[in-house]
Regions:
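Short alpha-helix in the alpha/beta-hydrolase fold that links the catalytic acid
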Residues: 20, 142-151
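Gly/Ala-rich beta-loop-alpha elbow adjacent to hydrolase catalytic centers
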Residues: 71-81
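Short, surface-exposed "cap/lid" segments of acyl-processing enzymes
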Residues: 2-46
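Catalytic active-site module of serine/aspartate enzymes centered on a nucleophile-bearing elbow/loop
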Residues: 60-63, 171-183
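A conserved short beta-strand
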Residues: 90-104
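Acidic catalytic loop of the alpha/beta-hydrolase fold
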Residues: 14, 136-141, 166
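Short beta-strand/loop motif that positions the catalytic acidic residue
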Residues: 126, 131-134, 138
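Catalytic histidine-centered segment of alpha/beta-hydrolase-like enzymes
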Residues: 48, 164-176
């Protein structure tokens, strides 16, 4: 049976179909048939509401089994880690992969929906491997955000790619390599 991955999209009009679908296609190509990537369209992608995305993620979590890999891009990664910190899922995640995720709180972005968190290490499911990725040429989320997450998650693996943008130039080969390392 194929190993499960859920990919949580970023926000913005048409992001699911026009932008993050390219990341998913790259990930599927790099990982091959041994992995099955779920790519749900999140509600109100052009103006995400935390409560609505949270409810959607919790529903998606019910479909996942122990060892499933969680991947979030941009605000999808931000919401994913906040949901995990608030309400650990019933399954045991095999890994958490955040790509160009905005950090909410001091030094990062403000939010009316999400609490500032500095306690991710204590709140995430115990032992979950965490990987943080960011393109150094990201013109949407400053690279400083990945370092804020790194401070909140000292056990995380951090990868910053020179010359790559918010979409990591639609190249998920490094993410796929790290996912395969968990097997």
């Amino acid at each position: 049976m194929a190993k499960q991955i859920i990919f949580v999209q970023g926000a913005g009009e048409g992001v699911h179909a026009r932008w993050d679908s390219k990341l998913v296609a790259s990930l599927e190509r790099e990982l091959g048939e041994s992995y099955a990537v779920r790519y749900p369209q999140m509600p109100g992608e052009d103006d995400p509401d935390y409560a609505a995305w949270r409810a959607e993620l919790i529903s998606e979590f019910d479909l996942l089994e122990d060892g499933a890999i969680l991947v979030g891009h941009s605000i999808g990664g931000t919401i994913l880690i906040h949901v995990l910190a608030e309400q650990p899922p019933k399954f045991r995640p095999g890994g958490l992969f955040l790509i160009a995720a905005p950090f909410i709180g001091e030094g990062g972005w403000p939010s009316d929906d999400m609490d500032d968190r500095k306690d991710f290490s204590e709140r995430l499911p115990p032992g979950i491997p965490v990987y943080l990725y960011h393109g150094a040429d990201d013109d949407i989320v400053p690279t400083a955000h990945v370092h804020l997450y790194a401070k909140a998650l000292p056990h995380a693996v951090v990868r910053v790619f020179e010359g790559r943008d918010h979409q990591l130039d639609n190249d998920m080969s490094d993410v796929a390599r790290d996912i395969r390392l968990l097997d």
